[in-house]
């Protein structure tokens, strides 16, 4: 908080003295009321109501003005309100009710209404999102791959709509996932083998000896394709919007499958260039020809040299006039993009991306799509519009005619070639990897008394740096969403070059995922970085609570002052089932002032409402 010093004023008339004292008192009360606007790490004019009152009203009336805010930076509200049960699946920046209230003019044909649009500070839901009635601790991996509690996601629309496609089946108090999909009714496992056979990979293994590791599955449904890729040592970023199928990604996350909400619309996906070896579309209902092929060009940006696009859709095989017309137009576009058909069988076609810039340079002048201008950064993604141009390879990639990455799993710990682009040496990379290996060992010693087998599956690293935290968890049956804060976004490419997945994000805003997504959230210096950007600690804590599962853990590594402040929130957030803190051992990444706090969230429910 800023401190204002007043000089002693001498005045003879008593009346003037009384007026001055009264003015200072009024000024003090004003600062007291608005103090959080100036306090480091505090929310600007965000207030909480008292007691356990639920927030029942519309988005514009969620603030209770009766609370007296703290003078000290380390004071906190007496309570944090609970959101109304209607908001048990709230995703703040994908809230279509907000679009109507703010009268946003979004182009529905371009899918802008499925993109990231956050509420202004005065319209934020600063309340704890409750679980649905009857919520249970999720079934543990690997059981969860095939079944989840119906009460946790009480939506059966997909089971009815896709009953003939083996997406999901309601079975008493559970929902089962047979492994089918719109295109692979007989199971994703058989479909994956068929793709490997089409590509003539040894042993019918789609990972091709570890050369294929990262996959982007667009329009993924309930992510059964990604679920069955895991046994092939392939990790997929399964992507789908919160559309008419609404809860498909929520089901995927409940199952413990790497997945996220997103759409190919007008903005670049939050992943750097050259992140994936393979992109997949199985009847994903995307118009790939729109806007001069801009959506295919986004896939082109994301694919590595020689990467594959698996397209299983009627346009690839149907012989009716309409589908043939679309298929021919796509073939023409791919040809101009220098892609070639690698394999075609039954209802699937696989296209291959060139391994260098040679074909681009041989095209006739004026051929569309053009190459992107030299000033375009293909790794810039946060709130950056897609571009209808081809991102050429770097000089190094063009010369070497490949990504330069070693096969998985060696690539997890081998220094990737693109380190030089962010000014990190191989020695620094190895040191970072070893540091995080030792840190995770210490974390697990602290967690061991509370962690049961397979009780942690979905993990988020809020500030992933070079991916060392996720790499150190590779021997555990978990997957990690590596989040790269916008101020460090150039490092995101290293995450993908290690065979990991993640997304760029601004922690001054809500993350685009469902409530109760993660079993463990790791925050290293995240609060210090948030404070430096002038954003709210309280907003960040409430957002962490929204995406943390009941009985999930947070590991917060930050300064002593920040940890002291956060500890005062543990009871308010219901993170007081268990907690511990320690002063960590010094290491190359440590600061002199550093504390590790681990806390566990309670399983709680809304109190019953008495009807008079």
UniProtKB/Swiss-Prot annotation:
It is a single-pass type II membrane protein. The keyword Transmembrane applies. GO terms for cellular component: endosome; Golgi apparatus; Golgi cis cisterna; Golgi membrane; plant-type cell wall; plant-type vacuole; trans-Golgi network. It is an enzyme of class 2 (transferase). Residues 36-612 are lumenal. Glycans are attached at residues 107, 383, 562. Its EC number is 2.1.1.-. GO terms for biological process: methylation. It holds the Pfam family Methyltransf_29. The chain crosses the membrane at residues 15-35. Keywords: Glycoprotein, Golgi apparatus, Membrane, Methyltransferase, Signal-anchor, Transferase, Transmembrane, Transmembrane helix. InterPro entries: Put_SAM_MeTrfase (IPR004159), SAM-dependent_MTases_sf (IPR029063). Residues 1-14 are cytoplasmic. GO terms for molecular function: methyltransferase activity. It is found in: Golgi apparatus membrane. Belongs to the methyltransferase superfamily. This is Probable methyltransferase PMT9.
């Amino acid at each position: 908080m800023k401190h204002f010093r007043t000089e002693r004023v001498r005045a003879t008339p008593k009346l003037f003295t009384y007026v001055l004292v009264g003015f200072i008192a009024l000024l003090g009360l004003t600062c007291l009321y608005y103090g959080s606007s100036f306090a480091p790490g505090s929310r600007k004019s965000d207030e909480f109501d008292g007691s356990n009152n639920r927030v029942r009203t519309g988005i514009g009336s969620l603030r209770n003005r009766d609370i007296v805010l703290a003078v000290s930076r380390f004071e906190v509200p007496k309570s944090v309100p609970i959101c109304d049960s209607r908001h048990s699946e709230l995703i703040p920046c994908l809230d279509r009710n907000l679009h109507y209230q703010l009268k946003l003019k979004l182009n529905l044909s371009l899918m802008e209404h499925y993109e990231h649009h956050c509420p202004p500070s005065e319209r934020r839901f600063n309340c704890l999102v409750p679980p649905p009635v009857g919520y249970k601790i999720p079934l543990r991996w690997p059981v969860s791959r095939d079944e989840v509690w119906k009460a946790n996601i009480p939506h059966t629309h997909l089971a009815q709509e896709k009953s003939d496609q083996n997406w999901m089946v309601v079975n008493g108090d559970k929902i089962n996932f047979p492994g089918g999909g719109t295109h692979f009714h007989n199971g994703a496992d058989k479909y994956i083998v068929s793709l490997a056979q089409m590509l003539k990979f040894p042993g019918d293994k789609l990972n091709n000896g570890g050369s294929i590791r990262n996959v982007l599955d667009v329009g993924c449904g309930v992510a059964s394709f990604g679920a069955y890729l895991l046994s092939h040592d392939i990790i997929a970023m399964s992507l789908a919007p919160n559309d008419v199928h609404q809860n498909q990604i929520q089901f995927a996350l409940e199952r413990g499958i790497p997945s996220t909400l997103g759409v190919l619309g007008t903005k670049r996906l939050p992943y750097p260039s050259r992140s994936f070896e393979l992109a997949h579309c199985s009847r994903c209902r995307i118009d790939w020809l729109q806007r001069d092929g801009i959506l295919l060009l986004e896939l082109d940006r994301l694919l590595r040299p020689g990467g594959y696009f698996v397209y299983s859709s009627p346009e690839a095989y149907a012989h009716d006039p309409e589908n043939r017309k679309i298929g021919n137009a796509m073939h023409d576009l791919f040809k101009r993009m220098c892609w070639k058909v690698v394999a075609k069988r039954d209802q699937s076609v696989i296209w291959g991306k060139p391994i260098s810039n040679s074909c681009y340079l041989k095209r006739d002048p004026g051929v569309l799509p053009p190459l992107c201008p030299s000033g375009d950064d293909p790794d810039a993604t946060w709130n950056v519009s897609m571009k209808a141009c081809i991102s050429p390879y770097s000089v190094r990639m063009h010369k070497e005619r490949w990504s330069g990455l070693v096969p998985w799993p060696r690539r997890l710990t081998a220094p990737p070639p693109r380190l030089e682009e962010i000014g990190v040496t191989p020695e620094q990379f190895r040191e970072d990897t070893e540091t995080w290996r030792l840190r995770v060992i210490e974390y697990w010693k602290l967690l061991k008394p509370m962690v049961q087998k397979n009780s942690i599956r979905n993990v988020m690293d809020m500030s992933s740096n070079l991916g060392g935290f996720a790499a150190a968890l590779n021997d555990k049956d978990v997957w990690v969403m590596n989040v790269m804060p916008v101020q460090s976004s150039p490092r995101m490419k290293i995450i993908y070059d290690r065979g990991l997945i993640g997304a760029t994000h601004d922690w001054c805003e809500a993350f685009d995922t469902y409530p109760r997504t993660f079993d463990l959230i790791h925050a290293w210096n995240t609060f210090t970085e948030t404070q430096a950007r002038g954003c709210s600690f309280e907003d960040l804590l409430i957002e962490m609570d929204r995406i943390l599962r009941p009985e999930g853990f947070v590991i917060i590594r930050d300064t002593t002052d920040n940890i002291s402040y956060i500890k005062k929130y543990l009871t308010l957030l219901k993170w007081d089932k268990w907690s511990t803190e320690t002063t960590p051992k010094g290491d190359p990444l440590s600061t002199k002032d550093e504390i590790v706090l681990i806390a566990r969230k309670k399983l709680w429910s809304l109190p019953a409402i008495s009807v008079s």
